[in-house]
Every structure is written in C-alpha cells, then in structure tokens.
Amino acid sequence: MKAEYKFREKITDDIVDAHETIRVTAKALTEGKIDKASALDNLARALKKLESAKYYIERG
C-alpha cells in the first residue's frame, strides 16, 4: 500500500535533488575537481533538502 501524502511531489523532488547533489559531489571529490569548502557547502545543501523532505513527510 502506498502512503498517501499531500506533498508527494515536493518530497520526491527534495529527495531526488539531495541524491543528485551527493552523487555529483562524491564524484567531484573522487576526481579531485572540488575543494573541501565547496564539497561541504554542497553536502549541507543536500542535508537541508533531506530535512525538508522529512518535514513534509511528517506533515503528511
């Protein structure tokens, strides 16, 4: 049974955005194409997206 959320699209968008940010940041770090400060900034943004998704899930 799928959960019924009023904010399904927002939740999905936030999770997909966070996943993509983390994936791209990890790849750039592995390839040495990003500095630590930028990587941390990107990961902080991804965390905010996940926190947003959590908020909307709890609002349900």
Language model features: what each stretch is:
Residues 1-4, 58-60:
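Short intrinsically disordered terminal tails
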